[in-house]
C-alpha cells in the first residue's frame, strides 16, 4: 500500500501522493544514503523508475482531454 495513505489528510494537489512516494523512494535508496548522491542524480541513473513513470503518466493525464473523462492515472 502506498505510504501516503497512512495517517494523512486528503491531498489538495493532483498526483501529490505519487510525488510524495517518489520522493520517499529516492531519499531511502542506496544511491542517496550510501553513495551520497543527490536525488536528481539517482533519478537519472534509473532508481525508482516505476514511480517516476507513474508520476509522469499522472501529470500527463491532467493535460489530456480524453483522460479528463476517465479520471487521473496513478493512485
Swiss-Prot record:
<dbReference type="GO" id="GO:0033617">
    <property type="term" value="P:mitochondrial cytochrome c oxidase assembly"/>
</dbReference>
<protein>
    <recommendedName>
        <fullName>Cytochrome c oxidase assembly factor 5</fullName>
    </recommendedName>
</protein>
<feature type="short sequence motif" description="Cx9C motif">
    <location>
        <begin position="48"/>
        <end position="58"/>
    </location>
</feature>
<dbReference type="Pfam" id="PF10203">
    <property type="entry name" value="Pet191_N"/>
</dbReference>
<keyword id="KW-1015">Disulfide bond</keyword>
<comment type="function">
    <text>Involved in an early step of the mitochondrial complex IV assembly process.</text>
</comment>
<dbReference type="InterPro" id="IPR018793">
    <property type="entry name" value="Cyt_c_oxidase_assmbl_Pet191"/>
</dbReference>
<feature type="disulfide bond">
    <location>
        <begin position="31"/>
        <end position="58"/>
    </location>
</feature>
<feature type="short sequence motif" description="Cx10C motif">
    <location>
        <begin position="31"/>
        <end position="42"/>
    </location>
</feature>
<feature type="disulfide bond">
    <location>
        <begin position="42"/>
        <end position="48"/>
    </location>
</feature>
<dbReference type="GO" id="GO:0005739">
    <property type="term" value="C:mitochondrion"/>
</dbReference>
<feature type="domain" description="CHCH">
    <location>
        <begin position="28"/>
        <end position="66"/>
    </location>
</feature>
<comment type="similarity">
    <text>Belongs to the PET191 family.</text>
</comment>
Amino acid at each position: 500500500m502506498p505510504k501516503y495513505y497512512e495517517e494523512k489528510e486528503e491531498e489538495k494537489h493532483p498526483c501529490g501522493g505519487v510525488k510524495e512516494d517518489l520522493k520517499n523512494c529516492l531519499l531511502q535508496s542506496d544511491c542517496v544514503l550510501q553513495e551520497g548522491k543527490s536525488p536528481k542524480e539517482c533519478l537519472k541513473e534509473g532508481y525508482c523508475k516505476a514511480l517516476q513513470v507513474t508520476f509522469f503518466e499522472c501529470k500527463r493525464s491532467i493535460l489530456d482531454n480524453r483522460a479528463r473523462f476517465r479520471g487521473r492515472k496513478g493512485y
